Amino acid sequence: MTATSGGLVAVHAHPDDESLTTGALLATWAASGRPVTVVTCTRGERGEVIGERLAHLEGDGPALAAHRDRELGRALAALGVRDRGYLDTIRGSVDQRFEDSGMEWVGTGRAGRPDEIPPGAFVGVGLEEAAERLARVLRSRRPEVVVTYEPDGGYGHPDHVRTHEVTQWAVDFARSRADDASPAFDVPVVLWSVQGRLALQRGMRALGGDAVLAALGGLRDDLELPDPTAELPSVAVPDDEIELEVDVLPVRTRVLDALRAHRTQVQAVRAIDDDSALVGCYALSNRILAPVLPTETYRRGTGGSGDVAWPDGVRPVA
């Protein structure tokens, strides 16, 4: 990572999360000419792999990590982001690699910790150690905004939950401590990525409509539709809790190109033009279609002490 000042710092658990959850914000911020930094906590070594061509990577941690790093580079280039790094490459008190902790499905759309935590797993890293590394980034970049997940990590993945915890601790450490290179810094705004429940359910219902079927070339046996009446993941919040919106359509091409870059993780990426409930769709390795909503939404997190002048395409909800 290279030194900058101001701007946006996004903190994510694995390669692909930056595009799936904050792609429009990153692309909009970068297009405004403001600096953007993406910090990724692990390399996704234990992720599933989509498709036969790359199936040999699944279970081969080092090979999958190297491949996903290349995917991340292409995705960030599509979003216009140049400054990026892994949390374990930032100087800390110990020399330690932070690895994907893995997960187990514990319900529909809900992840939890695996029965056995593998050696080097991110969830096993000391919280203060990881947070102080990130705090170094915040002090050196001095961003206007820090963005990460809500407290349950969007859907309960242990690395996402840990990333939220590390980010919140780092914001506090950056404010209360200096380091040998930078003075203390109080982050003005902390954002958590969320989705309004009603908007998400509308988008899920629209996935069964004619516009999506046309974009996919008809019904596909390898994909499933979500159940909008099922229990929603923790990323879904009451619509009146949304505090910030990002218009997706002006940067949709960049966001979809970023999703396509993550070929081991994301499939069936399509633009949708004829339905007001969504502007695109995709599926992960679970083969369940998901909507790209017209707006990417956020709520204010804890720790921020001020406000910023938002770029065009980003607006607070009155």
Predicted regions and their residues:
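Metal-dependent de-N-acetylase/amidase catalytic core
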Residues: 1-11, 112-318
